[in-house]
Amino acid sequence: VFMMDKGVWNGKRLLDENWFEEGMSAQIMQYAGQDLSEEEIAVLKQDEWNHGYGYQMWISSDGAPRLDGAGGQICVIYPEKNLVIAVHCHTNDTMGLLKSIRTRIASQF
């Protein structure tokens, strides 16, 4: 809720809204500084990990910021849908979990 409200908690602003705008968008690309062709970048972007990194948040291929932990801890934020999905489970397939979140839950909103 705090992240969806961009720094407001119980009606009081605790963090600047700009921090969330910046932090939930790509601040760095994983391939920055490399001399890559458009084709090479397109191949890299087939991987969920290569869509940018904000402030402790990965940017997913669909543009949704996400927080990842080890073994199935994931939180995906869809501000345009007013939706936050948090999962804590045991899996070695974080990208499969992300795909399920996207196709089975987020797509319903």
Question: Which positions does each model-derived feature cover?
Answer:
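Short, gly/Ser/Thr-rich active-site loops of penicillin-recognizing serine hydrolases
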Residues: 95-109
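Non-transmembrane alpha-helical segments in soluble domains
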Residues: 1, 20-24, 54-56, 102, ...
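Active-site-proximal alpha-helical segments within enzyme catalytic domains
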Residues: 1-8, 73-89
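Active-site-proximal binding-pocket segments
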Residues: 1-25
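A short acidic/small-residue loop/turn micro-motif
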Residues: 91-93
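Active-site Gly/Thr loop motif
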Residues: 24-84
